[in-house]
Amino acid sequence: MLKNINPTKTVAWSELKTLFDANADLKISTLFANDPQRFKAFSRQFDDHLLVDFSKNLITEEIFTKLLALAEEVDLKGAIKAQFSGEKINVTENRAVLHSALRNRSNTPVFVDGENVMPKVNAVLEKMKAFCTKVHSGEWKGYTGKAITDIVNIGIGGSDLGPFMVTEALRPYKVEGIDAHFVSNVDGTHIVETLAKVDPETTLFLVASKTFTTQETMTNAHSAREWFLNFAEDETFVAKHFAALSTNADAVAEFGIDVDNMFEFWDWVGGRYSIWSAIGLSIALTIGFDNYEVLLGGAHEMDKHFEETDFENNIPVILAVIGVWYNNFHGAESEAILPYDQYMHRFPAYFQQGNMESNGKCVDRNGESVDYQTGPIIWGEPGTNGQHAFYQLIHQGTKLIPCDFIAPAVSHNPVGDHHAKLLSNFFAQTEALAFGKSKETVEAEFAAAGKTTEEVAHLIPSKVFAGNNPTNSILVNKITPQTLGQLIAMYEQKIFVQGVIWNIFSFDQWGVELGKQLAGQILPELTTVNAVDSHDSSTNGLINAWKAWK
């Protein structure tokens, strides 16, 4: 079981605080000037697929060593063992945390409550494979005898963000003749606009809800069912066009779905980690089951690296402790994930959920309020779009924003010199953020342009870049199912490590519940014309204004 250790009370934390104070004026430029081989010392490569360069960070060898010592002191090794062995480390829900078992391609036994879960995991995978084969071969036909051409995944949170992100990232691997669509928002616009794009005769809906009671998902599912029956006019045809990713067989059957087309998963699979489970069916249908298996395999490879590698060379651990350094010692409040690959445009949003839902906690594993920072704000957009939007603040603003830059060495679309131009920006941005531009350089540039110092004195301060902004550069040989699996697992395990260090429970999400409870109480009040007075004056005023306007 996870130990309950307040990180701020450890020896390593105290030593890191001393090091932070002693290195208050540390400059990335000085670190490189003092060590021309810094890149070699502060980069790691994984299986010729990923290169992680963390040399452009505000860390010395001594700081790095103490950060790893912090991981040792909070018993990260024991926590890793507890995760992979099926211990119930999700204590508040009394559950194991075993998304790693879903991608356990070595098929070694994994036990929960004395039962090896791998036979059930493999059975669901085989069922998914058979289902994909039927759809892709045209054997599965709609109510008019036509083959399926469109998949509509109806879910929310992990049942939507993950599958959408992966199918977008792996669009070059899309099965010909199959288009995927994703509906999540309970705003009727989302389902209406999606249904306008598809044909009821050739569309297969996947309803992704473990309990089959999720409000947003079931509202959209019933609207899709009603839309479908407006054309099909026979409820028995629902079974030809709907499948379920759920464990509630009774509710699935009542909806009209054949329970043989219900794909189950387990309570030890968290929603934000569920792409590795039956929730990944939309991925498998979109990119092909063989490619889905390669995705699983890539994640398993990173899991093995994480489980077996010493901390000094362990990529998720390294990224995690660097994040702790900025979050808890430098006072950084956010981290940016910046993929230089258009297919990866939803990757930052996916790990916005993955990180903030996991580590956005203010209570430690002892049930006490923490007096230190936990999870950071995660955000980002693809490059180079972000360069023309928010990079200004990262370069010259007043906030420290550590950034992860991600780019593939090889493009799926090698058009002209597009990729060289993209990568030139990828390389240039981390260099600019680290080293900046001095006043002397700015003055020399103006002089070369024939300007006198007097003419441009008012401009010079605005053109100086202080630099010293930390980044990690993650170079991928190519975005493939394998490397994407590795990247996702890398970030997942980074999040786990940080949760262990911060002494919080990373696998519950009670913060999601309160708003849902209150919405359930408010909904009946919206069905009457009467003014409400049962809330605070702000909420009453908003509800009553809505009633007057609707």
UniProtKB/Swiss-Prot annotation:
GO terms for molecular function: carbohydrate derivative binding; glucose-6-phosphate isomerase activity; monosaccharide binding. Keywords: Cytoplasm, Gluconeogenesis, Glycolysis, Isomerase. SUPFAM superfamilies: SIS domain. It comes from the Bacteria. It is an enzyme of class 5 (isomerase). GO terms for cellular component: cytosol. InterPro entries: G6P_Isomerase, G6P_Isomerase_C, Phosphoglucose_isomerase_CS, SIS_dom_sf, SIS_PGI_1, SIS_PGI_2. It is found in: Cytoplasm. Pathway: Carbohydrate biosynthesis; gluconeogenesis; Carbohydrate degradation; glycolysis; D-glyceraldehyde 3-phosphate and glycerone phosphate from D-glucose: step 2/4. Coiled coil: none annotated. Its EC number is 5.3.1.9. Catalyzes the reversible isomerization of glucose-6-phosphate to fructose-6-phosphate. This is Glucose-6-phosphate isomerase. It comes from Psychromonas ingrahamii (strain DSM 17664 / CCUG 51855 / 37).
